[in-house]
Amino acid sequence: MTKWTLGYSYPIALTISLIPALTPAIVQAAPLTPPPATGILDGLCYDYVPKVEKLAPGKDANAQPVEVDADRLEAKQGGTAVYQGDVKVRQGVRKFDSDYAELDQKSRDVIAIGNIYYNDGQITVTSDKTLKSNLDTKNSELEEGKYQVHGSPVRGSADRVTMTNNNQNITLEGAQYTTCPPGQEVWTLKAGSIDIDQTEVFGEAWNASLWLYDYPVFYFPYINFPIKDERKTGLLYPGYTQSSKNGMDITQPFYWNIAPNYDATITSRFMDRRGLMEQVEFRYMPDPAHVGSLYFENLADDKQYDETPSLNEKLSDGHRYLLNARHTSLFADNAMRVSVDYTKVRDRDYNYFNDFSPKVGTQVENQLQQSLMAGYFQQNWNLNTEVRTYQILLASAQQPHELMPRINHNYYHQGNWYDLAWNTEVTRFGYNNTQASAQNLGDAYTGTRVYTAPTLTMPLIDEAGYYLDSQYKLMYTRYDQEVPDNMSSTFTKRFTPEGASGVTLDEGIITRTLPSFRLKGGMTFERNQDWFGGDANQTLEPEFQYLYVPYKDQDNIGVYDSTTMRQDYYSLFSDRRYAGLDRISDSNRVSLGVTTRVYDQAGDERIRLAVAQAFDFVAPRVKLYPSESLATNTRSPLSFEGDAKINEQWFAHAGAQYDMDQSEISSANSALEYRREKLISQLNYRFVRNANYDLSNTNQVADLNQVGMLLTTPLNDQWHLYGGYYHDLDQGVKVDRKVGLKYDSCCWSINFNLEWVNTPDNVTMRPTSERSLGIQFEMKGLGSVGTGSKGTSLDTEALPYIRPFNLRDQ
C-alpha cells in the first residue's frame, strides 16, 4: 500500500495492485513469454492495449511529489477530510480519479465513490461504485471493478476485489477474464472466486466455467493458473491426434516443478491400437555451465506385435522402449567442453521411430548416434576426444565402425609470410559384433589408426583483385589392423578384387606416407552495368587449382570412416577425393572454375552463377574398395550452380553435375520460390542417380527423382492455408502429402492438418502409408488443447523446408 501525503497534510491511501492477479493461463512447463505475441494479427488486434509506463531507473515511486486537485475540500469535525468533484491525484506515473473521496483520520478508513479510475502504469482499474481501504490494516475492497493490464491483452471484471496482507492476498469474486479485444469476446473464463497470493506462482479459481460467446462449454470445480513467469507442479493440457497406424492417440502430461533448476514431465500416452505408453523427461541445470536431460518412454506390450511381421520376427515380445540422455558441461571459462548425446531403443526394434516419432535422438541415415565428447580449446590449438557408437535402425544395413575413442589435436600458427597447421589424430575403431550377429551379418575388421599431417601454406601473390597460394602437406598414417576369420560377406565382397580369390586386407602394422602439393589462385574483375534500369556491379571471378598427390596402393587398409565425397562446385577445389582418412587418392589434377555475381545499388547479391570442371593428367588409381573398377575418366562431371534474387518476391536456384563421358546428368536440384509478406510458395526438384531403393525390388537401387510443391498463404485476415506435396517421378510414389487450414483471430485460433506419408518399413523395405490428423485449438492467454503444429509450418514428416539460395545477405 502506498501512503500519499497531500499538500493539505491529509493522507489518502489508494491501494490497487492487481497485476499478478490478472495474467491467468494454462499450467506450463516453460516460462511464459510476455504478450502480446499471440498471432498473425497482433498489430490490428491490440492497438487498444495501453503501454507500460515506468519511472526512470533509480527513482522511488513513493518518494515522488503528490499533486491533488478537486473542486472542493472540506474538513469535518471529528477529523474527516472530504474531497468532492472531479478529484484527481497524481504521483509520478500513478493516477487516481473519483467523484468523491473521504478520509477518517481516527479510523484511518478511506472511501472513494463514483467514476473511480486508477492507473499505475502497469494496470488500469475502473469502477462506478465504491472503494474502501484502511491505512493501518492495509486492507482494501473495490466493488464492480474492470481491469486492463498494460502491455498485454489481459482484461476483465470482478463484482468485488478484496486485498489483504499488504496487498499480497487478493480475492476476486464474480470474476471474468479474457484476452479478446472489447466487443469481440469469443471466450471468457468466469469464476465464482479467484484467490491470488502474490508470493506464490499460481492463482486458484473455484466454480469456474469457460464460455464461448454466450454459451458455457467447460466447467471446472477448481483450476489453477500461473501469475508469474515461473513454473509449478500441475497437469498440462492433453494432446490428441488420430492416425492410421496408432489409431486414437491421447497424451496427458503432468509437470513436476522439483526445484528452480530441476523439473520433470511425466506423460501418459494412450494409443488404442497399441496400448499405454509412459514417457518421462527429467531436466536439470545445477548451474548454467552444466545442463542436461534424461528421457525415457516405455510401452510394456504393443498390441500390434502379433499382427506385424517386422515386429514378431525380430522381437521376442511386444515390449518397446527408448532411452535418451543429453548433457553439456563447460569448464575453465568455457575453454573445456564435455557433451553426451545417447539414444537407444530395444535391440532389433528397427521401426521404433517410424511407429512413435519421438522428438529426441540424433538419427543419421537410420543410425542412432551414441556419443561422448570432450575438448579443450585455445586460440591457436585444441585437443578433443570422442567415443561414438551406433544403433542401426535398418535391418539389412551393415554396422559402421565405432570410435573407441578418437583423439584429435589441431595446432595453428599464422606468420608474416606463411600459415602453419598441424593435425594429429589417434583413433581406435571398434565394431559391435553382438549387434552384427543379431543381424546375421558376421564380424568386421578393426584397428587403430594414427595420423599426423603438418601443412604449410605460403601466399605467393596477395594483391587486391587476385591471389595465388601454395600449400605443402606431408601425411603420415599408421594402422594396427585385426582381420577376423569369420568376416561379414559384405566386407569380403568389397575387399576381394574382381577375378581374385581372397581379400586384400592385411593384418598387423601398415604405414602410409604421402606428400601433397597444392597451388590455388583466383582473380576478381568488376564492371558497372545496368540492372533493370538501375546501377549494378558485376564481378567475374575465375579460379584454378592444381593438386598433386602421388599414388600409393591402399587396398590392404580397411575403410573405417571414409566415403566418396559429394560432387559439386566446391568439392572440385578441395584437396580430397574421399571424406575421411582411410583413402588418400592420388591426384594430378587441374580444377578450373569461374563465378560471376551481380550486386545491386544496396550491395545485395542478386545473381550468382558458377561453373567448374576438373581435369586429370592421369586417371586416379586409388579406389574406395578393391572390388570397384578403376576410374578411366580423366575429367570430372561439369558442375554448375546458379542462384538469383529476381526481385523482392522471386528467388531461383539450380544446380547440376553433368557426366560428359557418360553423356548424362549424375545429379541435379532446383527450386523456384515466391515470397510476399506471409505468402510462401516453392516448387523444387531433386535428382541423384542410383541413390534410392527400388521399392519393387529392394535388392536393386533406383534413381532419386522427386518433385515437391510447398505453399503457405493467408486467405484473408483470419484464414491461412498451408501444405506440401512430394512425388517420386521414377517410382510413381507419393512420398508425402500435407494440407492444413488455420483460423487465427485476435483471441483464439484453431488449426487442422492432415498428412499422408510413405515411409519404408525398416525390415521389409516395403513402403508403408501413414495417415494422421492433427487438431490444435488455442485460446490466447489461457492455453491450448490438441496436438500438431500451432503454426503453418512448411516442414513435412518426411522432408524439411529448405531455402537453397546461396546468396549473400539472403
Swiss-Prot record:
Signal sequence region: 1-29
Location in the cell: Cell outer membrane
Protein name: LPS-assembly protein LptD
Family under the similarity heading: Belongs to the LptD family.
Keywords: Cell outer membrane, Membrane, Signal
Quaternary data: Component of the lipopolysaccharide transport and assembly complex. Interacts with LptE and LptA.
Pfam families: LptD, LptD_N
GO biological process: Gram-negative-bacterium-type cell outer membrane assembly; lipopolysaccharide transport
Record's function text: Together with LptE, is involved in the assembly of lipopolysaccharide (LPS) at the surface of the outer membrane.
InterPro entries reported in the protein's UniProt record: LipoPS_assembly_LptD, LptD, LptD_C, OstA-like_N
Gene Ontology cellular-component terms listed: cell outer membrane; transporter complex
HAMAP family from the UniProt entry: LPS_assembly_LptD
Gene3D superfamilies linked to this entry: Lipopolysaccharide (LPS) transport protein A like domain (2.60.450.10)
Disulphide-bonded residues: none
